[in-house]
Amino acid sequence: MFNKLHLVSLLACGLFVIAQANTVKKCEKKMPASLKSQLCEIRKYKLLDTPDMDKHMDCVMKALDFVRPDGTGDYHKLIKPLNAIEKDRKHDFNLEKCGGQTQHLPVGKRANAYYKCLVESTSGDAFKKVFDTVELVKAKKLPALSQYSSVVDKLMKKIDDKICN
């Protein structure tokens, strides 16, 4: 009896997590009004330091699964994809540095600060490629195990053109 109850509980939790799954598109739909006019710039990695951007990037970074529920960066979710784009020890250093710099910030500011730190780091170009690839995978525009390629750039351009024009 206990095992059946335990199994039902686990299944219910799993379904709840699936129902809560987010995408960048969902985050953009509920982004604060103050950012709506800047969506194109934000999608092109313009960095903003406002409470509304903190809220938006918290949603986005959680949707992409790059940060934990408390907004702290998740080293293990990014190191392998970064090294798949460019094998370099700098990624380890930058993930550690950005994680360390942001982990003691207020919870609502962590994800945006982590994002900004990575974009501005020497891993920035590789991070943007990982970010775009994962965004497309989460939106089901690419298969789950996809890696960065020129297809990512083409799909992102198509999405950005639709949003920005």
UniProtKB/Swiss-Prot annotation:
CDD domains: PBP_GOBP. Residues 1-21 form the signal peptide. The keyword Disulfide bond applies. Histamine binds at residues 115, 132, 135. Disulfide bonds join 27-59, 40-164, 98-117. GO terms for molecular function: odorant binding; toxin activity. Gene3D superfamilies: Pheromone/general odorant binding protein domain. Its main location: secreted. Serotonin binds at residues 28, 56, 115, 132, 135. SUPFAM superfamilies: Insect pheromone/odorant-binding proteins (SSF47565). Female salivary gland. Not detected in female carcass without salivary glands. Not detected in male tissues. The keyword Secreted applies. SMART domains: PhBP. It is found in: Secreted. Modulates blood feeding of female mosquitoes on vertebrate species by binding and sequestering different mediators involved in the host response. Binds serotonin and histamine. Increases blood clotting time. Belongs to the PBP/GOBP family. This is Short form salivary protein D7R1. The lineage of its organism: Eukaryota, Metazoa, Ecdysozoa, Arthropoda, Hexapoda. The gene is D7r1.
